[in-house]
Amino acid sequence: MDQLNVKEQQDFQQIVEQKQMKDFMRLYSNLVSKCFDDCVNDFTSNNLTTKETGCITKCSEKFLKHSERVGQRFQEQNALLMQNMQKR
């Protein structure tokens, strides 16, 4: 990153931010799709039932905890990789 000039650093930062937003939107879309498909079964009303609301809450919490855990493991593996690269 130090080898880049200011303009290149700004461009790189913009690309990173765009990728992060794309990843966030993909995560959100997957969450909505999965929890809706798993929890919403009754289309006779325009309101969610208490059971559906509870299911969506549990589903979204579980999905987000899983995503957080995967992110933590990725960070741990990345840290190990960086340590191994520094030892060389």
UniProtKB/Swiss-Prot annotation:
A motif (Twin CX3C motif) lies at residues 35-59. One of its GO terms (molecular function) is metal ion binding. Keywords: Chaperone, Disulfide bond, Membrane, Metal-binding, Mitochondrion, Mitochondrion inner membrane, Protein transport, Translocation, Transport, Zinc. Its main location: mitochondrion. InterPro entries: Mito_inner_translocase_sub, Tim10-like, Tim10-like_dom_sf. Belongs to the small Tim family. Heterohexamer; composed of 3 copies of TIM9 and 3 copies of TIM10, named soluble 70 kDa complex. Associates with the TIM22 complex, whose core is composed of TIM22 and TIM54. Interacts with the transmembrane regions of multi-pass transmembrane proteins in transit. This is Mitochondrial import inner membrane translocase subunit TIM9. It comes from Debaryomyces hansenii (strain ATCC 36239 / CBS 767 / BCRC 21394 / JCM 1990 / NBRC 0083 / IGC 2968) (Yeast).
